[in-house]
């Protein structure tokens, strides 16, 4: 009976030591285990218990280590390497690769050559076939040598009616492009004014004065040269006779009786200011309508 009680006490001691190793907190001992541990001596040594605990599997929180890569020298090139499966290409990528394989030089559309250019190529080649060879003409006109050969070999020529029709179409095309540019504000209208047909001559006369001034030393105009650009007022016979006499003498002239006389308004009819203002407005509108190209270089 005593041997059985001693073995039981030894088991309790071992369990208590294992528990103390597993948990950091001090375990609560009971009166039975306390009495048994103090009354009986342990038969299992403490070093044996520690050795048994350390030999058990331990848990590590560190990430798993990556496998070491094999050096390049150890790789056997004779064995086929496993390649990753490629993703299926979309339809547009397949078509793009096919076009690249077919047209290695890229997108080079044919250059359209006008009939005048073809005629120039024929004339140059007929003048000097060595200087204007097929290769030189191809480099000059930026087209392929095969196109130059076809142009030189072709015997087709346009008739006179076809040539006239083609030139008319080109003229209409030029006018249409100019009208479109004028609508977009990229080109100004013709400087010739329909209201005053003689205005172009006056502007050209003013421009010639400026050109003559630029050639002189210093490039300065005379004092009253800027008045030459504007048309002078033409006086009638009555107005000319009124200017010859005394401006303050109103006897015998009925047109100045009811008018306000001053140093500027004398010798003018009653409605002369209105007519002169209308004329200046018309002239200003013409200058604005012509654009900057039709104006004299003031």
Swiss-Prot record:
Which family is it part of? Belongs to the RRG9 family.
What does the UniProt entry say about where the protein is found?
Answer: Mitochondrion
Name of the protein described by the UniProt record: Required for respiratory growth protein 9, mitochondrial
**UniProt organism field:** Arthroderma otae (strain ATCC MYA-4605 / CBS 113480)
Q: Which InterPro entries match?
A: NGRN/Rrg9 (IPR010487)
Transit peptide extent on chain: 1-41
Q: Which UniProt keywords apply?
A: Mitochondrion, Transit peptide
Composition bias (Basic and acidic residues) maps to 225-243, 251-264
Q: What does this protein do?
A: Required for respiratory activity and maintenance and expression of the mitochondrial genome.
Region annotation Disordered: where it falls in the sequence: 35-92, 186-298
* Listed Polar residues bias regions: 35-63, 205-214
Q: Which GO terms describe its cellular component?
A: mitochondrion; nucleus
């Amino acid at each position: 009976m005593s041997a059985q009680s001693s073995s039981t006490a030894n088991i309790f001691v071992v369990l208590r030591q294992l528990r103390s190793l597993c948990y950091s907190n001090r375990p609560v001992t009971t009166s039975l285990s306390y009495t048994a541990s103090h009354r009986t001596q342990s038969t299992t040594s403490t070093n044996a218990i520690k050795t048994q605990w350390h030999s058990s599997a331990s848990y590590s929180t560190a990430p798993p280590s990556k496998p070491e890569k094999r050096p390049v020298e150890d790789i056997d090139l004779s064995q086929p390497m496993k390649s990753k499966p490629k993703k299926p290409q979309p339809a547009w990528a397949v078509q793009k690769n096919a076009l690249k394989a077919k047209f290695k030089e890229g997108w080079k559309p044919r250059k359209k050559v006008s009939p005048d250019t073809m005629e120039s190529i024929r004339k140059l080649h007929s003048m000097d076939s060595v200087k204007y060879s097929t290769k030189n003409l191809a480099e000059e006109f930026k087209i392929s040598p095969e196109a130059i050969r076809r142009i030189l070999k072709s015997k087709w020529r346009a008739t006179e009616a076809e040539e006239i029709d083609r030139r008319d179409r080109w003229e209409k095309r030029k006018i249409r492009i100019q009208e479109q540019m004028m609508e977009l504000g990229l080109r100004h209208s013709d400087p010739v004014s329909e209201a005053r047909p003689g205005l172009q001559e006056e502007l050209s006369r003013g421009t010639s004065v400026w050109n003559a001034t630029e050639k002189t030393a210093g490039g300065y105009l005379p004092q009253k040269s800027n008045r030459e650009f504007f048309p002078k007022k033409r006086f009638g016979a009555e107005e000319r006779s009124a200017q010859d006499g005394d401006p303050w003498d109103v006897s015998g002239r009925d047109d100045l009786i009811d008018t306000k006389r001053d140093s500027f308004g004398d010798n003018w009819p009653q409605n002369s200011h209105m007519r002169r203002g209308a004329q200046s407005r018309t002239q200003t509108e013409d200058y604005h309508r012509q654009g900057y190209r039709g104006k004299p270089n003031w």
